[in-house]
Amino acid sequence: KECMVDGTVCYIHNHNDCCGSCLCPNGPLARPWEMLVGNCKCGPKA
């Protein structure tokens, strides 16, 4: 299965498909909401 390259927007349903990590700007508390609205992007593995 191909992984999503860095910079690809990642959502709750596919955040595990990032080649690295799904990175959200505002920390863990906002994470579910941010994933919902598309604020998170794949980035280097944390």
From Swiss-Prot:
Disulfide bonds: C3-C19, C10-C22, C18-C42, C24-C40
Recorded GO MF terms: toxin activity
Keyword set, alphabetical order: Disulfide bond, Knottin, Secreted, Toxin
UniProt tissue specificity: Expressed by the venom gland.
Region ranges (Keys region for toxin activity): 31-33
Location, primary (coarse class): secreted
Subcellular location per the Swiss-Prot or TrEMBL entry: Secreted
GO cellular component, one term: extracellular region
InterPro entries, alphabetized: Insecticidal_knottin-like_sf, Toxin_28
A Pfam family matched in the record: Toxin_28
Family the entry assigns: Belongs to the neurotoxin 16 (SFI) family.
Function field: Insecticidal toxin. It inhibits insect voltage-gated sodium channels (Nav) by partially blocking the channel pore in DUM neurons from the American cockroach, not by acting as a gating modifier. The inhibition is only partially reversible after prolonged washout. In vivo, the toxin causes flaccid paralysis followed by death when injected into Heliothis virescens larvae. It also causes uncoordinated movements followed by full paralysis to sheep blowflies (Lucilia cuprina).
Record comment regarding domains: The presence of a 'disulfide through disulfide knot' structurally defines this protein as a knottin.
The protein's name in its UniProt record: Mu-segestritoxin-Sf1e
Species this protein is from: Segestria florentina
